[in-house]
């Protein structure tokens, strides 16, 4: 059986709000859509933190559990938990084999966490990962730049994912958006 991958996650801070969106498509290799309703964005730490994944589904669940454990260990300190996950992920021979990326956010901080040890906080409050990530990132940046007060973070996240779904064959229109205000 081929590698099963999930696709596009987008996150944004905008006008005091924040939102994360993900599509529902899970693809086997490059040929078969296995599921269209996967939930790749979740609430953690009593609903105060959002986390989303792109990559291998089983690997992502391992990372979700690890991140949630660190988040609890460090009493909700998002940056500390992300750094500790990245250190453990990069330093452990077995964990280094995991093929996934995480976006994590709370009301004030947005981070990308990868297995190569990166913990990246964007300058503009926008991140996107997965096969449609570049499309969602481009759409989201344009929307945020020109939306001003007319769009919420939730609306920007949903519109960015809709744009990615129109372009990327590995991203569908079954979009789940979670927001913190």
From Swiss-Prot:
Q: Any idea which positions bind Na(+)? A: 165, 168, 171
User: Which reactions fall under this protein's catalytic activity?
Assistant: ATP-dependent cleavage of peptide bonds with broad specificity
Identify a single GO molecular function assigned to this protein: metal ion binding
Q: Report the EC code(s) recorded for this entry.
A: 3.4.25.2
* Compartment annotation: Cytoplasm
Q: What is its main location?
A: cytoplasm
Name the enzyme group at the top EC level. Answer: hydrolase
Does the keyword Cell division feature in the UniProt annotation?
no
- Record entry for activity regulation: Allosterically activated by HslU binding.
Q: Which InterPro entries match?
A: ATP-dep_Prtase_HsIV_su, Ntn_hydrolases_N, Proteasome_sua/b, Proteasome_suB-type
Pfam families per the record?
Answer: Proteasome (PF00227)
Source species, domain of life: Bacteria
Q: Could you list this entry's UniProt keywords, alphabetically sorted.
A: Allosteric enzyme, Cytoplasm, Hydrolase, Metal-binding, Protease, Sodium, Threonine protease
Q: Which residues form the active site?
A: 7
**An example Gene Ontology biological process:** proteolysis involved in protein catabolic process
Q: Name one GO cellular component term.
A: proteasome core complex
Return the similarity comment. Belongs to the peptidase T1B family. HslV subfamily.
**Subunit arrangement?**
A double ring-shaped homohexamer of HslV is capped on each side by a ring-shaped HslU homohexamer. The assembly of the HslU/HslV complex is dependent on binding of ATP.
Q: Which PANTHER family match?
A: ATP-DEPENDENT PROTEASE SUBUNIT HSLV, METALLOPROTEASE TLDD
- Function summary: Protease subunit of a proteasome-like degradation complex believed to be a general protein degrading machinery.
The protein, known as: ATP-dependent protease subunit HslV
């Amino acid at each position: 059986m081929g590698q099963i991958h999930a696709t596009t996650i987008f996150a944004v801070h905008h006008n005091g709000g924040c939102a994360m969106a993900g599509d529902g498509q899970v693809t086997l290799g490059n040929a078969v859509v296995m599921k269209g309703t996967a939930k790749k964005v979740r609430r953690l730490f009593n609903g105060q933190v959002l986390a989303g994944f792109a990559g291998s589904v089983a690997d992502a669940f391992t990372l979700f559990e690890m991140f949630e454990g660190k988040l609890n260990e460090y009493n909700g300190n998002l940056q500390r938990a992300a750094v500790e996950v990245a250190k453990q992920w990069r330093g452990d021979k077995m964990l280094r084999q995991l093929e996934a990326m995480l976006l994590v956010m709370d009301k004030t901080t947005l981070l990308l966490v990868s297995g190569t040890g990166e913990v990246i906080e964007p300058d503009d409050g926008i991140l996107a990962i997965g096969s449609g990530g570049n499309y969602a990132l481009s759409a989201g940046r344009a929307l945020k730049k020109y939306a001003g007060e007319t769009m919420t973070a939730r609306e920007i996240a949903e519109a960015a994912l809709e744009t990615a779904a129109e372009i990327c064959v590995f991203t569908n229109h079954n979009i789940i958006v979670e927001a913190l205000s």
